[in-house]
């Protein structure tokens, strides 16, 4: 629908959805100090961009830290009507990812670990059962049965921060993985020419893929190529936003990174 004002013509659309938001408007969702007041400020900033629904994203840290962050988010969601409206659930990115340089990205290596199903379900309890999306590396020990378990419970499994072979990626997809997280990022700048995890994921028809389309994480020509290969029905655009998004230049924290 087109809406006209005196100065401009606007298009009225449905609210946008973002599957990966680590923080926004000066507020870090990975901080154990999150309060309802801070979250309300962040939600209003997110809403002003046209995003109506999103998944707060918690990255690799100690189990204690992860439980605090998830329980704080869940408490705030219950306290704030706007949070209950906008937060569809939570995205757990890590800690079951690759430790290899480049593939680990900004995740603290000391807290990256093998799959621990009992640990995950303790985190799920802290989150009130609302972890809806888990990003993991399928080559990590224990990943394949974990993918089957999560898929069976209706939790979406995404592949990310991975150096898996094409065979392992295929096995992960057949076990229930549905998505590639920020494909083209969280990887090494030095990959094999043909058999590498980016090409392997692009070639899997059952995998959708999310991309950070800011012209910084992926050059426009690279993103254009990825989109052509995947096709628009298998593409999800995300921000992977942090606390520094939408604020003035300065010093901000994302987890333990400043």
Language-model region placement:
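Divalent metal-dependent hydrolysis catalytic cores, especially in the metallo-beta-lactamase
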Residues: 22-28, 40-69, 85-98, 127-139, ...
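Gly/Ser/Thr-rich active-site loops/lids in small-molecule metabolic enzymes
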Residues: 35-37, 116, 254-258
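Metal-dependent catalytic neighborhoods of phosphoester/phosphodiester hydrolases
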Residues: 64-75, 103
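Short helix-capping segments at alpha-helix termini
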Residues: 78-85, 127-129, 152-153, 230-231
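Divalent metal-binding pocket/active-site signature
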Residues: 92, 99-196
